[in-house]
């Protein structure tokens, strides 16, 4: 807010209003990562245990499972928030439609950023399990520096002002994840093949995002604008789930290490 007031000359009321738009988006930004922590907590100890036994092959499988499950959860959650940012905010904040509309811009970028927050959590856990605790500290420092610099430049630009904040947040976490993945590739002998790991989830998520946005565009013609987003989300979930199972993006080995993993695998008929 100080940048908005001191550099751009906004009044305190105007700066507060702009910052309020950003915080609307931040409220939903923190939700997807909260679902990733249980995945990391359940799988990372498996990596450490396998390494303690000297079973590097098992450690490699657990590493791949941790990253894959994180990707399978984070991609649809973040992409969904991004492509349906406006409708979701209008549903949650009907009393302030103008603010919800303005906040949609922020959530569009923050939705993408939360994908990388989730991947940061998982990759940090993997590096710590391999005894590379200093690397997440270094990459977080690099991301923090980039965030500060880009935030100062973009928020201080009258053309972008507070709209630069979510973009700088996205830059920050993208850098952290890229550096973490490079570190895993160099430090982990049994590193997973990244193309194999990310290709199917990315493809499925792209189709899901198109389905979500397209179905909302159709539903809003026959339902109240505020409520049309709910069936659109349901359609997106179904599309993603069906494609993930049909294309083999989720296997029994991926979920077996989760709490109730055996039961989940049986329910989904995973092999």
Which residues are covered by each model-predicted region?
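Helix-terminus/linker motif at the lipid-water interface of multi-pass membrane proteins
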Residues: 1-24, 49, 89-98
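Alpha-helical transmembrane segments of polytopic membrane transporters and translocases
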Residues: 15-36, 68-72
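Interfacial segments at transmembrane-helix termini and the short loops linking adjacent helices
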Residues: 16, 82-114
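Helix-loop junctions and terminal segments of transmembrane helices
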Residues: 34-53
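Short alpha-helical transmembrane segments in multi-pass integral membrane proteins
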Residues: 62-92, 162-188, 201-202
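Membrane-interface junctions at transmembrane-helix termini in multi-pass inner-membrane proteins
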Residues: 112-142, 152-153
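Membrane-interface helix-loop junctions in multi-pass transport and translocation proteins
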Residues: 134, 142-182, 192, 210, ...
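Membrane-proximal transmembrane or re-entrant/amphipathic helices at the cytosolic face
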Residues: 214-271
């Amino acid at each position: 807010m100080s940048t908005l007031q001191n550099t751009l000359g906004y009044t305190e009321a105007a700066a507060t209003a702009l910052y309020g738009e950003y915080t609307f988006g931040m409220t939903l930004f923190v939700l997807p990562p909260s679902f990733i922590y249980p995945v990391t907590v359940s799988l990372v100890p498996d990596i450490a245990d396998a390494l303690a036994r000297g079973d590097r092959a098992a450690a490699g499988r657990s590493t791949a499972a941790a990253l894959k499950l994180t990707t399978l959860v984070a991609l649809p959650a973040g992409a969904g928030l991004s492509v349906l940012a406006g409708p979701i905010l209008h549903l949650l904040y009907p009393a302030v439609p103008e603010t919800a509309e303005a906040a949609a811009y922020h959530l569009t970028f923050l939705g993408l950023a939360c994908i990388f927050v989730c991947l940061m959590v998982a990759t940090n856990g993997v590096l710590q399990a391999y005894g590379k605790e200093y690397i997440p500290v270094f990459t977080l420092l690099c991301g923090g520096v980039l965030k500060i610099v880009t935030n100062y430049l973009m928020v201080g630009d009258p053309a972008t002002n507070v709209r630069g904040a979510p973009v700088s947040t996205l830059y920050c976490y993208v850098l952290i994840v890229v550096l973490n993945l490079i570190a895993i590739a160099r430090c982990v002998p049994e590193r997973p093949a990244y193309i194999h790991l990310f290709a199917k989830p990315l493809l499925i998520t792209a189709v899901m995002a198109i389905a979500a946005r397209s179905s909302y565009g159709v539903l809003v013609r026959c339902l109240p604008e505020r409520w049309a987003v709910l069936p659109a989300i349901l359609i997106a979930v179904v599309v993603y789930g069906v494609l993930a199972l049909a294309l083999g993006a989720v296997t029994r080995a991926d979920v077996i290490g989760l709490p109730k993993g055996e039961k989940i695998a049986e329910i989904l008929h995973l092999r």
